[in-house]
């Protein structure tokens, strides 16, 4: 992460801020700050003066991934589409993945400070930052490293954790005081398992074991990007991250669990999952822009903390988009769907996903050049059947032709209004796979959303489906527009 931040600073995209901001529960200013900075496509910030923080002297990293360009920079690109194609290409070709490299613990920055056993006290040693109306503070910067308890297959996933210091109980109760010192509630959907960490947790539970986990915070952004991608089960996201960054990720063995973590992480927490201890947590601001009032999650008991001598803490929240990690969450969604579709359908040119998770698939052909009638609907079904974790959860998918910019929603709307008939050119699915936090779906506190309607819109030209010809588009030639711009230089 520090190399990435240095690149941002050199580029003028990282600012050090000494102005005080309130980070306390109930009075915090950070949701408003997030809204203000992200709505302006503002820079990354290092906040050096957050009032109410329980760990003095720890700077708070804010908004590092807040634009498409900065997210592209995490894997060495400036252009968003080039970064997406790079992600899709590496994901689709595991021969380009680079296995992680194990390094000597003595040289690992994440082990400059080691705290074990009775010395562990999360309420004193880990920053707690509140956003909006959230009841607890949440760890939002961390990846979970785990192994399949049966096969040993590795997994890295980006999950949230509830901290218990000064946390309000969503049902009006109280948490045991020791929770604040050693425990976190983990956003692991494990029963039934809706993720790889869920599978690992569920397997360990069935085997009568406690799953070992290592939670690494503020790491190489390429690893954060990889951990948000749906790679094949039991594949190593750290190797995928190596392929994305062009060199192996340096890893180091943990102190108290049989796992490896990134050697350059700012923080590492080692512990075990207690599926027999569940806690209701809330409020939590989710990525679709609503507060979850109550959710039930298992406890992770921490037995070791390691960190850099002068660590950085990354704090963010989810809310109505845009927000800080919107785009680093969207790039893997777009990349994994594009990677899968291009293997099966060469006419797929691009996949764009909006911050609100509307999918737009751009084809390289349209009209009479389409391979067969109803080709747009064929593509819609392919999105819902795509490999990875995201395509199957697409609530709204729109297919457009090559003359429609999938990133320009005005153009997408134009294609819909002039090429789409709602009854004839749509697919409605009543039993689709949901985005797990969608508040409009059937949902439970423990299982999340479990069923969603889905809609697909074929906004391609309906040749040969209904017509043999279509009116010519009335559109200015781009070269002519550029010539006019030069002609009016200094006037407009």
Region locations from a protein language model:
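Extended, highly charged
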Residues: 1-492
